[in-house]
Amino acid sequence: MSRWKIYTPDGVQDILFDECYKKREIEKRIRNTFRSYGYYEIETPTIEFFDVFSSEIEHFPQESMVKFFDQKGRILVLRPDITVPVARITATKNRDVQVPIKYSYIGNVFRFNEVGGGRQNEFTQAGVEMLGDSSSESDAEIIAMAINTLKSVGLKEFKIEIGQVEFFKGLAEEAGFSNEDIDAISKQIDKKDLVGVEEILNRYDISTELREIVLKLTGLFGSVDVIKEFKKASINGRSLKAIENVEEVVSILCDYGLSEYVSIDLGMLKSLNYDTGITFRGFTNGVGFPILSGARYDNLTSSFGKECPATGFSLRINMLMTAMEKAGHTFERPSVDSLVCYEKTNRKRAIEIAEALRKQDMKIETFVLTKGIDQAKKYAASKKIGGIIYIRDNDKITVYDIKNNITEETSFDTLLNNQ
């Protein structure tokens, strides 16, 4: 036998009964939340051309993508994300559809990640995208949906941190940072590295006030009062407009009754080339990584030949499952209701009974006896099946209530009429 035949590659896993039930239940609740807002589901191909993800606007290093060739020598990838294909669809197949266009999706994506911290090379991504609306209302709706999605699966203790990349871009413009330093300082701010930010600022002759504002981005975050603190400063029009956008979004979220879940972090600057306005991330207690993230990305569709404002969010189902486990939230897989067992001579009647009970919305397994009824009892106990229906002949049936240790004789008609 080949050495690797019994293993799975790094970063992928088998999902067995209990975990798979939990995953499907979470997906069902998420899907229902998306539909309740009018975001209907689409599917995109698992395999895409490499070019779809190779634009400067996207943020997927080519070494993180799973690449291979088709029969014509063209480079293909297993999709590392679903937002980008949604942008492709909008610019091509839905080019003339009335806006805003509201999409939802749940599907597997593939990236070479550092395995650990809940990260996998294959994981299920769920999300929504709204294209064609540049308003604060659309940003707030997306954030509200993110909050209500987490609530729908049972999470209670979490925060959505809201940022706005245009605030920093306005400061960088005023300071005259080079493109190289904009990239470097934004990374330091996002990591809350005060010393790293100071090292870059020391290379520029900027006002004391502007310097202090930039430094505050590494440490001033939390309640909505952060907005007021930054508004006191003398900032340019671009940064002021960004602050006002955040204010309006927070005000709308108050109207949704969701302000308790919101905090502010204007130093959230992970994807400056991709994000064009509001950004946000979701965190919960005991989990050191975001369980969801979202942003406005108005430039993405332009790489496919159409200008279209856009906003959305996505989450990783496996990370959400980890967060829920740490929060003590469980989904118990329901057991089979009854085991219908029989000798082969009574097979037809057993199948008839099993099918009739299934039509009554019961979960029924069948079991062929070869070593007597104790064989069925042992099997039922191992699978936590509460009852056994033993078909002795066409109209002689013994019912075993294993949980309450009760045995009774019954008939075909009585059995079906009592369920």
Curated annotation (Swiss-Prot):
Gene3D superfamilies: Bira Bifunctional Protein, Domain 2 (3.30.930.10). GO terms for molecular function: catalytic activity, acting on a protein; histidine-tRNA ligase activity; transferase activity. Pathway: Amino-acid biosynthesis; L-histidine biosynthesis; L-histidine from 5-phospho-alpha-D-ribose 1-diphosphate: step 1/9. InterPro entries: aa-tRNA-synth_II (IPR006195), aa-tRNA-synth_II/BPL/LPL (IPR045864), HisRS-like_core (IPR041715), HisRS/HisZ (IPR004516), HisZ (IPR004517). It is found in: Cytoplasm. GO terms for cellular component: cytoplasm. It comes from the Bacteria. One of its GO terms (biological process) is L-histidine biosynthetic process. Keywords: Amino-acid biosynthesis, Cytoplasm, Histidine biosynthesis. Heteromultimer composed of HisG and HisZ subunits. HAMAP family: HisZ. Belongs to the class-II aminoacyl-tRNA synthetase family. HisZ subfamily. Required for the first step of histidine biosynthesis. May allow the feedback regulation of ATP phosphoribosyltransferase activity by histidine. This function is generally fulfilled by the C-terminal part of HisG, which is missing in some bacteria such as this one. This is ATP phosphoribosyltransferase regulatory subunit. It comes from Ruminiclostridium cellulolyticum (strain ATCC 35319 / DSM 5812 / JCM 6584 / H10). The lineage of its organism: Bacteria, Bacillati, Bacillota, Clostridia, Eubacteriales. The gene is hisZ.
